[in-house]
Amino acid sequence: MAEADAAFVRSLVIYADSSLIAFNKPSGLPVQTRNRDDQTLDRLMAAFARSNGKRPRLVHRLDAQTSGVIIAAQTQPAAAALSKAFADREAQKTYLALVSGPAPEAAEGEIAHELARYAARPGLELMRAARPGDQHAQSALTRWRRLASAGGLHLLEIRPLTGRMHQIRVHLSLNGWPILGDPYYGGAGGLASGGRVRLMLHAAHLSLPHPGRAGRVCLEAPAPDDFLAVLSAAGLPAPADLVSGPG
């Protein structure tokens, strides 16, 4: 591995111990791809390989254009415990999302549309609201809270209670609030001032049972500069003092 790549992935570390390592993944870095030439977070785990060749194993995913906290297990027992925590819905996740659309009528709420996958084109699967008769409809529940609004844009705190593919993105779109910068679910446009923006979805907090000791580990990934710059351009406050984190 090139030293520059190793230095890059080490700069993303926000927490590490003998059981797990956590990163603040930037937008645009895929977790995994089928293309062997792509730089991915999974391939960058080689920077942490031990003398026996074993390296940390990622135990969950973020969409390539979503930034924020993501964790890898340092050992096989830790990988099993962390994977079980996600499967058993013991992981509490909090995201930030900048959406466009009508102002929320309440301060907070829930979205509970069932979802189903569909092939948008060869090689691209997306999600939609499930229809009567869909054999593989998946229940999905997302909680939201409005943090701030300005000029038809709304900064929301999002807590998904299930972990479906693209759940937050499609749920918000179905509720009339596409995430800014989302080309698949209605938010492809940028700010009124011009220019496209990144997908404005950031995984800010993650709390789950620690795989190597009693209690939980609570991780925080500060919103990156490219996310904060869009908020500033939209006239919205930085989220540091607005988000309560998982509880």
How would you describe each model-predicted region?
Residues 1-247:
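RNA pseudouridine synthases
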